[in-house]
Amino acid sequence: MKKVIFSGIQPSGQLTLGNYIGALKQFGQFQDEYECFYCIVDEHAITVPQDRLKLREQTRSLAALYLAVGLDPEKATLFIQSEVAAHAQAAWILQCNVYIGELERMTQFKDKSDGKAGVSAGLLTYPPLMAADILLYQTNLVPVGEDQKQHIELTRDLAERFNKKHADIFTMPEVFIPKQGARVMSLQDPTKKMSKSDANLKNAIFLLDPPATIRKKIKSAVTDSSGIIEYNKEEKPGVSNLLTIYSVITGETIANIEEKYVGKGYGDFKTDLAELVVAELEQIQERYYAYLESEELDNILDAGAEKAARVANKTLKKMENGVGLGRKRRK
């Protein structure tokens, strides 16, 4: 029996090369080995204010990108969170089994609420919904970045608490972090993670950036004054970040890349890297635009929601029975 992978991405902002290398690129590889559920978590997105038309546009766009990067709907399940009602229902049950202190300690809540006068309750109770997303599918592995590990730890705590207190129904999920490429850094400030929400657009390469923009961003990426192309994350974070991108896209080891560019300068290296990134993303963009307005995309999402609901509803029913919700029917 295959192990289960669950992964969710919010449909907010354009996806970056960092999202692709850190998560999306691996999705096509996972689907042959695991039972994969890929969820567009639009209910998470509304924990902060959203424009309703833009949110729907970004949700569809993200679904098309999932398929464009190689997700096969015959092998993996792609669906939209809000189209499977069990997520919100299970989240409420888990919310009643989590403590306020646990939620207030979440680093992401502290970061997003810091200095803001009006913070939604949804931002505080985000973790139980994330836990529901994962636990409904009896998930074994959750591919996440380092910044999400705290949420997975809370998910495990909630699963263990529910199993002991109510009913032993949840599989304990494990964090799965790819060994390389899990953390692509900002092009202008390589001490920070590349982010789709960064105000400075030069910091990130977006998956739908045109070729000229990609080349310009890579050529202007921060390096250092040594001119030597070698990996040293502490002393040469900019070059190290570019080497990581090169390595993940080509499959070459960083040592081989370093050897290839002995005696060459940053200009040659950046030019070559830019062309590699352009070639990689042009293929994705072509497939993306073919899917975006197609009836096929709607059919794939409908089928994905139906399959996800069948699995999730089984777990939800066990949760409801475990806490005593609903009624026991008489004959």
UniProtKB/Swiss-Prot annotation:
Q: What is its main location?
A: cytoplasm
Localization in the cell: Cytoplasm
Has keyword Amino-acid biosynthesis? no
Show the catalytic activity.
tRNA(Trp) + L-tryptophan + ATP = L-tryptophyl-tRNA(Trp) + AMP + diphosphate + H(+)
- Short sequence motif 'KMSKS' region: positions: 193-197
Q: Which SUPFAM superfamilies is this protein grouped with?
A: Nucleotidylyl transferase
Spell out the molecular function terms from Gene Ontology. Answer: ATP binding; tryptophan-tRNA ligase activity
> PANTHER family recorded for this chain?
TRYPTOPHAN--TRNA LIGASE, MITOCHONDRIAL
Q: How does it assemble?
A: Homodimer.
**Family, per the entry?**
Belongs to the class-I aminoacyl-tRNA synthetase family.
Name this polypeptide is given:
Tryptophan--tRNA ligase
